[in-house]
Amino acid sequence: MGLLKKKDSTSARSSTSPCADLRNAYHNCFNKWYSEKFVKGQWDKEECVAEWKKYRDCLSENLDGKLLTRILEVDGELNPTKQATDSKESSS
């Protein structure tokens, strides 16, 4: 029972986040993709990219001035193709 209370309080805390809806949309998309496609060996196409970008942008805006923005910078360093795609989209 203690776990349920802790889980509920964590859920309540995250729902007050300005990015909570975007986070939920991304997680729902990812979980659906993982369970319906990835597990079956169908991972050719990048899915949930739009949801991830919206969530990442929201985090970036809301974490400005905090050391947590480093997480988003590391994501770019670990995914250089994503940086190239983001650059192409911003220049269009």
Curated annotation (Swiss-Prot):
Annotated segments matching region Disordered: 1-21
Motif Cx9C motif 2: chain residues: 48-58
Swiss-Prot/TrEMBL keywords: Disulfide bond
Ranges spanned by the short sequence motif Cx9C motif 1, renumbered to the chain: 19-29
Extent of Basic and acidic residues compositional bias: 1-10
Any one Pfam family match given in the protein's UniProt record, by short name: UPF0203
Disulfide bonds: C19-C58, C29-C48
Superkingdom, natural source: Eukaryota
Keyword Disulfide bond: yes
Keyword match rRNA-binding: no
Domain CHCH: start-end pairs: 16-66
Family note: Belongs to the TRIAP1/MDM35 family.
Protein name: Uncharacterized protein At4g33100
Organism ancestry: Eukaryota, Viridiplantae, Streptophyta, Embryophyta, Tracheophyta
